[in-house]
Every structure is written in structure tokens, then in C-alpha cells.
From Swiss-Prot:
Cofactor(s) listed: pyridoxal 5'-phosphate
Name assigned to this protein: L-methionine gamma-lyase
Regulation of its activity: Irreversibly inactivated by DL-propargylglycine.
The species this protein was found in: Pseudomonas putida
Job of this protein: Catalyzes the alpha,gamma-elimination of L-methionine to produce methanethiol, 2-oxobutanoate and ammonia. Is involved in L-methionine catabolism. In fact, shows a multicatalytic function since it also catalyzes gamma-replacement of L-methionine with thiol compounds, alpha,gamma-elimination and gamma-replacement reactions of L-homocysteine and its S-substituted derivatives, O-substituted-L-homoserines and DL-selenomethionine, and, to a lesser extent, alpha,beta-elimination and beta-replacement reactions of L-cysteine, S-methyl-L-cysteine, and O-acetyl-L-serine.
């Protein structure tokens, strides 16, 4: 950029990477190519595009200039060769796993997963001959012991939704390379501003870009980043032929607008969450708190090794179980009772009855999701107002 070979900083790339206004009539903001199809100057040119011999667009389910800019920008931020934009986080996850797995293959999974990911695996792809096993991705000995010749993919979230359990990403990647398995990491909670799994050895990163990347709660979107070869496979197999989960150009433009302020928003999310977590840790109504920024967090050292900041998500368990959790939730006034996360607004949800309702009670207990667990997505409001709301809700929960 500007004649320098030095890689620009994160914020600079989030705003400028891959776009030159002079290539687009001087437009400061990238144009939106709101078109389904593209014309060819000749039949021969079109044939070359279809054969992959000529760079070009022919149908927006496969590629679109607006989406391609978003994809290049996300690849730069994650430190990957290529990116792929999709219609939702589940579009990204399903397109990726349908591409990588075949009947008879095995996928090793983190113990705790987002509820819809869990449902897709256990009630979707798992019914087509793909073997599923859950492993603690922080226990590298257990992971090594679980590997078999059929293991094709290792998939996990770090931190995990909703209990914040972390994986040793570099350690997992080292084991996977030895066995020829592909490592896929859901980096939604962190974004590339806080954690870059590809730099730790992962092969692919997936995001629900609906969350922090967008940051405004007004679109659904998904992202995949990895090597050019893997991303091309997912584009031409998982997206084009299997899910069709294409992101609209308009939503891609909104997502790029959100990414421009990602670093500023994440700094604020993290700062607010740290103060709120420290407050919760002192409250008599709280049985247990899960937040990577607290020294009491069991994986505090690992968090400091692979994350630059502890993030904006907090999970905690109230004394009194599910009844206390419901009373707390219903008493909130500033926090909104809603699924999703990463918005400017602070959100609260009860996993047992919301995002992880696809788990049985026994599965939730097995994977560390108690009936009284509350998850907070700490927003950008003034911290004093957030503290006051949580304090009065805690009193109501007792």
C-alpha cells in the first residue's frame, strides 16, 4: 500500500484492503454489484470462465465483485490465502463440512458446540455415514488417543459457546498434521482482531459474521478463510452444489462497513466485559463465572497465549439453578433477552432454553452447560449502566 512492502496494520487493512477508488470512478465506498448474472463478450470467453481458464464472473452464487472484495479483506485479516462469503454462519459451517467429509469418514469435535452446529452434526451429516466423536481439545493426550485412520476433520470452537472452554489450537494443529487431518476452527467469539487460528496452525477458520464482524445485528452472514485450494473446493462444491448459501451483495457491503470499525468495537467490548466479569466474580448470588480475563479462569494461561484480549462474552452460573436463571433473565432492563451476540446492544440468553435446546438435558450436563447458566454478550453501552442493570437483576434472582 502506498509504495511500501510493509504489511499495513489491522485497522488500515480492515478499511482499505483490496480496494482502489480510482478503479471505480473515484467512489470512496466500494460499489454494490446487485446482479445475479454477468454477460460475456464472446462465447469463447464464457467457455474459458466456466473452465476456470479465465478469471471472470458468470453467476453470483459462485462469485460477485462485491463479495470478492469482502473475501479478500477477511483473508488478509485472518492471515489466509483466500476467503469465501456465505449467507450465514451455518452456511459457512455446513458448506465446509459437506465438502470435507464423506461416508465412513470421522470428525473429532470439541465437547461444546453452538446448538445449531451440534444439531447439524448429530441430526444431519451424522446420519449420512459420517462418524462423530467429542473430545476435550485442551487435552492433547486424549486427542492423540482419539485419532484413527478415518479421522478427516477436527472441528471446534475456541472459546466455545456458551461455556467459554478453550482449545489448545497450536497443539491440536500439530497432532492433526501428523495424522493428515484438517483442522477447522470457529473463530466467531474472537474475530481475527483477538485471535488468528491460521497463524497457530489451523487449516480453515469459519465465522458467523452476523456477530462481531458485522457488529450491528442487521444482517446474517458467514465467512470461511484458509488456503486457496481448500477455499476453492468449498466454493465449487459445498456452496455451489450443496448448500447454495450465497450472501447477497447488499449484505456484503453492510458487512464490510461493520468490519471497518471492528478493532474499535472489540476494544470496547473487551473493556466492558472485563469490568463486568470482575463485578460478577464478587457477587454472592454467582456460583461460578467463566471469563478468560479472570485469573480464576481454569485456562487463563492458554487464553493469554493465543488471544490478545479476553473478548466480550461472559458465562456464569447462578446459585439456585434454572429458577434463579429465569428470574435473573426476566428482571433485566438494559440487557436484551435475545439470541446471537456481538452487537452494539448488550444481550443475555439462557442456553438451556435457547441456543442449546437441541441438546438433551443429559447432553448439556455432560458438556458443562448447566440448567442455570446465563450467557452475556457485553455491548458498547456505558459500563456503569450495565453494572446497575446486572446488579438489580441479581437481587431479583435470589
Amino acid at each position: 500500500m502506498h509504495g511500501s512492502n510493509k504489511l499495513p496494520g489491522f485497522a488500515t487493512r480492515a478499511i482499505h484492503h483490496g480496494y482502489d477508488p480510482q478503479d471505480h470512478g473515484g467512489a470512496l465506498v466500494p460499489p454494490v454489484y446487485q446482479t445475479a448474472t454477468f454477460t460475456f463478450p464472446t462465447v469463447e470467453y464464457g467457455a474459458a470462465c466456466f473452465a476456470g481458464e479465465q478469471a471472470g464472473h458468470f453467476y453470483s452464487r459462485i462469485s460477485n465483485p462485491t463479495l470478492n472484495l469482502l473475501e479478500a479483506r477477511m483473508a488478509s485479516l485472518e492471515g489466509g490465502e483466500a476467503g469465501l462469503a456465505l449467507a450465514s454462519g451455518m452456511g459457512a459451517i455446513t458448506s465446509t463440512l459437506w465438502t470435507l467429509l464423506r461416508p465412513g469418514d470421522e470428525v473429532l469435535l470439541g465437547n461444546t458446540l453452538y446448538g445449531c452446529t451440534f444439531a447439524f452434526l448429530h441430526h444431519g451429516i451424522g446420519e449420512f455415514g459420517v462418524k462423530l466423536r467429542h473430545v476435550d481439545m485442551a487435552d492433547l493426550q486424549a486427542l492423540e488417543a482419539a485419532m484413527t485412520p478415518a479421522t478427516r476433520v477436527i472441528y471446534f470452537e475456541s472459546p466455545a459457546n456458551p461455556n467459554m472452554h478453550m482449545a489448545d489450537i497450536a497443539g491440536v494443529a500439530k497432532i492433526a498434521r501428523k495424522h493428515g487431518a484438517t483442522v477447522v476452527v470457529d473463530n466467531t467469539y474472537c474475530t481475527p482482531y483477538l485471535q488468528r487460528p491460521l497463524e497457530l496452525g489451523a487449516d480453515l477458520v469459519v465465522h458467523s459474521a452476523t456477530k462481531y464482524l458485522s457488529g450491528h445485528g442487521d444482517i446474517t452472514a458467514g465467512i470461511v478463510v484458509g488456503s486457496q485450494a481448500l477455499v476453492d473446493r468449498i466454493r465449487l462444491q459445498g456452496l455451489k452444489d450443496m448448500t447454495g448459501a450465497v450472501l447477497s451483495p447488499h449484505d456484503a457491503a453492510l458487512l464490510m462497513r461493520g468490519i471497518k470499525t471492528l478493532n474499535l468495537r472489540m476494544d470496547r467490548h473487551c473493556a466492558n466485559a472485563q469490568v463486568l466479569a470482575e463485578f460478577l466474580a464478587r457477587q454472592p448470588q454467582v456460583e461460578l463465572i467463566h471469563y478468560p480475563g479472570l485469573a480464576s479462569f481454569p485456562q487463563y494461561t492458554l487464553a493469554r497465549q493465543q488471544m490478545s484480549q479476553p473478548g466480550g462474552m461472559i458465562a456464569f452460573e447462578l446459585k439456585g439453578g434454572i429458577g434463579a436463571g429465569r428470574r435473573f433473565m426476566n428482571a433485566l432492563q438494559l440487557f436484551s433477552r435475545a439470541v446471537s451476540l456481538g452487537d452494539a446492544e448488550s444481550l443475555a440468553q439462557h442456553p438451556a432454553s435457547m441456543t442449546h435446546s437441541s441438546y438433551t438435558p443429559e447432553e448439556r450436563a455432560h458438556y458443562g452447560i448447566s440448567e442455570g447458566l446465563v450467557r452475556l454478550s457485553v455491548g458498547l453501552e456505558d459500563i456503569d449502566d450495565l453494572l446497575a442493570d446486572v446488579q438489580q437483576a441479581l437481587k431479583a434472582s435470589a
